[in-house]
Every structure is written in C-alpha cells, then in structure tokens.
Amino acid sequence: MFKVNKAEEWLLKVSENAKPLSFDYYYGRLKKMSLLRAYDRYGIDVSFIYDPDNILDTEKKQLQEDNLDNSSLEHIAQLIDDRIEQIKYEYVNDVEGVAVQAGDGIFELLDDLEQHPIAGSPLYGPLINTVTRGARLKKFYLRSAATGVGKTRSMIADSCYIACNKIYDDTFGSWIKNGIQEPVLYITTEQDKNEIQTMMLAFLSNVNEEHIIYNEYQGNEKERVIEAAKILKDSPLYIRELPDFSLQDVENEIKKGIRDHDVKYIFHDYIHTSMKILEEITRRSGGVKLREDNILFMLSNKLKDICNQYGVFIMSATQLNGDYVDSKTPDQNLLRGAKSIADKVDYGSILLNVQDDDLISLEKILSTKLFDTPTIKMSVYKNRRGRYKGVILWCKADLGTCRIIPMFCTTYAYELVPIDDIKITLEEESAF
C-alpha cells in the first residue's frame, strides 16, 4: 500500500516544502480554533472573538484575524470566562453595586457637604447631638440598659422629639417650638399602646406619668397633658405593637410604614428572641437549631440592612448581662445574649445607674458646683465617624417624664472631656 500510493515520494515533497519556523504559528492557531469550537459546542457565542460566518465585513474579519493571532490561548479563554462570570455576578451572586473610581463624584460630595453637613434630626437632650450628630438616615443606633434604667423611656423621648413640633419646657414655663415634624414609627415588643401613649404624654407635657395614670394633677398639669394629647394627635408618630415577631415581620412593618406614612425614623424596642424568630430561623436553616447569639446577630444585621436598603434611621436596644454591675468600661461585652449585636451598629451606648463609687471618683468635678449630681451615666462605646467614644455622658434623669439630660462628659477614668453642646435645627424637609 505504501509503495502503490507513492508515499515515499509524497514524504520527500512534504519535507522539501515544509517550513519548520511556521510550525508554532499553525499549531497555536489549531489549538485556538479547537478551543473556540469547544466553547461553541456548549452553546457559548464566541463570534465576538472570531465569526466564521462573516464574509461581508472584511474590515471586521481582518481585525478578528489579527486579534486572534496576537492573543494567547489563555487570553482567549479568559475573555470568554469573563463574560460567563459577569452573567453569574448579575444573576447568581447576591451582591449589589459595582466598584467605582475613588474620585467619582468627589467635588459634588464636597459641594453637598458645604450646603448640608452630615447630621440628622436632633435627638433629645444636650450634648447627645454633639456625640451622635443627630439621628442620621441609613444609620443604626443601639442604646442598651439594665432593666428599669430607661432604655424604653429614652427612646420614647427621642421619637417624640423628632415627630412632634412642640414640647413643654419648665425653664420657660411654656411650650416651645421643636423644629419640623418627621414621620416616626415606634415598634413596641413588650408594652401595649396605652403604656406607650402615657409615656409620650408625660414627655411632651413634662408631667410625671404617675400623675397621668392616677389622674392626680397638680397646678396646670392637666391642661398641659391635654395640650400634649392634641400635639400627639396631629403628629406623624405611629405605634405598632409587635409582641411575637420574626425577622420578616420587622421588615414588613417598616416597609408598610414607609409606604403608608413616608416613615424615615424607626425606634424598635427591643432586640430579643421570640418564638416566631426561632421558628423562622429553624425553618430557614433546614431544621438546624442556632444558638441565641447567632439569632440576635441576625436580627441586628437585618436592622442594619433595612437602614441601608430603605434609607431610614433605626434605633434599637438590648438588655444587659450580669457583668454590668462590676464593669469599669461598659461596652459591647455587657450586651445580653451576644456582644456581636454591636458589630453592625453605627453608634452604641449603654445606660447605667450611677453608683456610690462613681460619685466618689467624680468628687473633684462635682465640687465645682457647675453640675448637679448625676443619677444615670451613658457609656458611649462605639461611634462610627464620630470623635467621642470610650466616654461617659453623666446625666440627671426624671424617668417619670422620660427626660434624661446629659450634663458633662468624662473618660472611663473620670477625666473631664471638653465638649460643646451642638444644636441641630431643621427648618425644611430633612435632606439627610
């Protein structure tokens, strides 16, 4: 067969005409075309690299030929894989947004900061807005406390201060204007509506809640409470009772508040587990039971996600564990259930009763007679983008009227910290 077909003669001609220097080119070309055909067999469009059906557009054909010759096998494979990864990124990966150049919109940002410094609606009390810069949208604040110290009452004060346009001031003996009214949703998980309402009336009128509950008014207190009731009636302040809630319930109620009332500020009282959350998490995890600290972290994470997704402000709270009694540096380690709750918050503080040891350590400051004797201390342990953290605000408190008044600031070592009382005034719809 070999001789009949003159194979020896054919091999000699091939040897004479062969160009060894071109071998690598044609071998590489063969591998590139084989690669493209392999992708094509799996239904992947590779015509953006090489289109064999293009016979009319000679310029495009020549350009693709040149690119194919000048591209390595690895580069061609990477071009195709990049397109596949882009599809996965858009439709499979649960990630939103893209990377931007660091200077993108930088001058617009500076112009905006010149007109609108970063601040939110003011919270109640002196010094607190210096520390927090107000209730900023897209931020999650956590204010924890031991039972009976005032976490609910302090949030009642803040919610009313944001939503109501007048409060009673004993200093002037009259009602004073309180800026504009911002829509607020107060989610209560333990108290019912009536309990929340009497605390709100007490704060606005500066009348002790017991006087309201027992209908035992002094002087003009009844008139002040009636005026406070009128203010509440006309304010965009909404109460939602949610005693047994899931993560989805919290998000749904906030979405409903945004949709129905244009709510921008949410107070959630407070972070703890419930039967419904346990059932929801067990169902989502395929029957695997998670520890309480993991569940509480998930709730905290959900609240922060809601802040970012819907552009709202959220404040919540937690109980404390037993270590708070002896702690010299009250921080996230005192949060009941899981210190990881604080990982997602933008501002974290803890309310504690002032102890005798505190007063002894404060003798030098209190001896100046510049401040009243404090009854509550507020430890600020976390403050993103804030100057003041690792400090204590010393307050005088009247929990009967839900009013906690910071007076001065110290380090954890009781050293006085200079601090100005910044006032935030909103005279038009908040731009924050």
Residue ranges of each PLM-predicted region?
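Accessory, often N-terminal, substrate/partner-engagement and coupling regions
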Residues: 1-83
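The Walker A/P-loop phosphate-binding site
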Residues: 92-207
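Cytosolic-facing regulatory segments adjacent to core modules
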Residues: 122, 129-131, 165-262, 388, ...
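Structural motif
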Residues: 142, 264-267, 315, 349
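Short, contiguous acidic/charged loop-to-helix segments that flank catalytic cores in large enzymes
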Residues: 146, 241-244, 276-297, 323-341, ...
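Structural recognition of the conserved hydrophobic beta-strand(s) that form the central parallel beta-sheet
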Residues: 186, 267-268, 312-318
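Phosphate-binding/switch loop-helix module in NTP-utilizing enzymes
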Residues: 237-306
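C-terminal regions of RecA-like/P-loop NTPase motor modules
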Residues: 247-263, 308-310, 322-432
